[in-house]
Amino acid sequence: MSSVSNSYKEFHRIILVIILASVGILILFINGDNISLSTPEDEDREFLNNFYSLVNDTNQVSQNYDDEIGRWKKGEYDNQQMVSITNSYLPQYDHLIANASNFNTPEKFQSALNLYVKSLSAERKSNELFRDFIETGSPDLNETATDLLSNASKFEFESFAMVNAQNDALKTVG
């Protein structure tokens, strides 16, 4: 009987350990802590995929808005229509900025992402001031909008340089 009793106790110990381990893992997930099974290289790849996707989305929004400005310049839209169009594009920039803020960003890419978000914010503000210029005709607003757009490009290029430098470093290590 004692061997059956020992087997029964051993079985219950194993079940108890499995239950406790499962509860521990469940508590970690409930508390919002993540158990990372990915490697730093996987995290870098995920960030780069997200970053390049963000850049593509941004380019699409910027190109579409620039096309609308072209139509306005040709007289296809009046000023009020262009103001409305600009107002419809501003939330798209907000969405891009929010999207970037939700990235799981490795530390080595954080400064580059911050610069890119700064670029998006400057481009958004430029479009906002351009809208105000259309409404008021104030050349100062147009000049400030142009300066902000120039800054947005500068921040974007700096961001790309930082990402490319980190990416090149990863290629030489890996």
Question: Over which residues does each language-model region extend?
Answer:
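N-terminal Lys/Arg-rich, disordered targeting/topogenic segments
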Residues: 1-10
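Intrinsic low-complexity/disordered segments
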Residues: 9, 38-41, 120
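Hydrophobic membrane-insertion alpha-helices, especially the h-region
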Residues: 12-31
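Alpha-helical segments in soluble extracytoplasmic regions
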Residues: 46-174
